[in-house]
Amino acid sequence: MIGKIETLWDEIDNLNVNNSKELETLRIRFLGKKGEIASLMSGFRNVEANQKREIGQKLNSLKVKIQTKIDQLKETLGCQDLSENLIDLTRTAYPYRVGTRHPISIVQKRICNIFFKLGFSIAEGPEIEDDWHVFSALNFAFDHPARDMQDTFFIKYDKNILLRTHTSSVQIRTMEKTQPPIRILCPGRVYRNEAISARAHCFFHQVEAFYINRNVSFADLRQVLVFFAKEMFDSGINTRLRPSFFPFTEPSAEMDIMCNLCRGKGCSFCKFTGWVEILGCGMIDPNVLDNCNIDSKTYSGYALGMGVERITSLKYQVKDLRLFSENDIRFLRQFEMAV
């Protein structure tokens, strides 16, 4: 056994490794459960009593020497790895491309933040809806064009199920579960069976706001509209209200702002009128309140809805709505600093 110990002792002096894998192999060979030291320890039991002290001391010294050698090799390898991985600060640096929010997300959040200032909170609903929440409860006549397949995407196997055409369905779901006062904001995606063009798409994003309480008037609605336009665009923005018709509001109106692309001079985006519609609005029809078990003789309310793509186009002067859904990185990178 003494000869074996002396052989290993001499071998340790000449040990060297090139990488961490070789070092681990070396450690297992000498210090592993089935390694050289373990083998010698196992044989130590059979050593004669008068030799145990001498051999035991040599065996312990060998074990210490092996551990010391492995620690030295590990430290040497660590220094080598560090020198190989040093960063050259003189090399040209290239910036990392950081992802940004989509312009639609930027504007939708901006819209929501404006209405948060007025005390509104967010409510959401499903994009796949039924006829009641999209049409019937909102006072749509059975022969209304919106119920036709030319305008709405119906589910093939059930004509009562469809992709919602507006977020007004969330208004109905909220009123069915909540009694006034109600002050709710409904952002989400909607779908319509329209040809895709620079001014229209088969899906887009909409935000609707509605308020129901005692003695709510059109004057309250108008004040909210003016506040929104100034906060969203500019404090000096020119606005106007035009009479309109929606089945779920009476009276109804549409709000226009002066075209931000041509400054009112007329262009293809505003159809050469100098004005662009940004939202529809009106006082909630009493029939809608009654459909949701809200007493229309006690309560009144207003509702307004806007297309986020339209607002985004005006705010950032984008002339083609299709750009928002094409995921062209060259287009999206322009909004890295947008707020």
Curated annotation (Swiss-Prot):
GO MF assignments: ATP binding; magnesium ion binding; phenylalanine-tRNA ligase activity; tRNA binding
Cofactor(s) needed: Mg(2+)
Reaction(s) this enzyme catalyzes, per UniProt: tRNA(Phe) + L-phenylalanine + ATP = L-phenylalanyl-tRNA(Phe) + AMP + diphosphate + H(+)
GO terms under cellular component: cytoplasm
Matches recorded under Gene3D superfamilies: Bira Bifunctional Protein, Domain 2
Cofactor: how bound: Binds 2 magnesium ions per tetramer.
Residues the record lists as binding Mg(2+): 250
Keyword Methyltransferase: no
GO biological process: phenylalanyl-tRNA aminoacylation
Subcellular location: Cytoplasm
EC nos: 6.1.1.20
Keyword presence, Lipid biosynthesis: no
Keywords: Aminoacyl-tRNA synthetase, ATP-binding, Cytoplasm, Ligase, Magnesium, Metal-binding, Nucleotide-binding, Protein biosynthesis
Family listed: Belongs to the class-II aminoacyl-tRNA synthetase family. Phe-tRNA synthetase alpha subunit type 1 subfamily.
Subunit description: Tetramer of two alpha and two beta subunits.
Listed name of the protein: Phenylalanine--tRNA ligase alpha subunit
Name of encoding gene: pheS
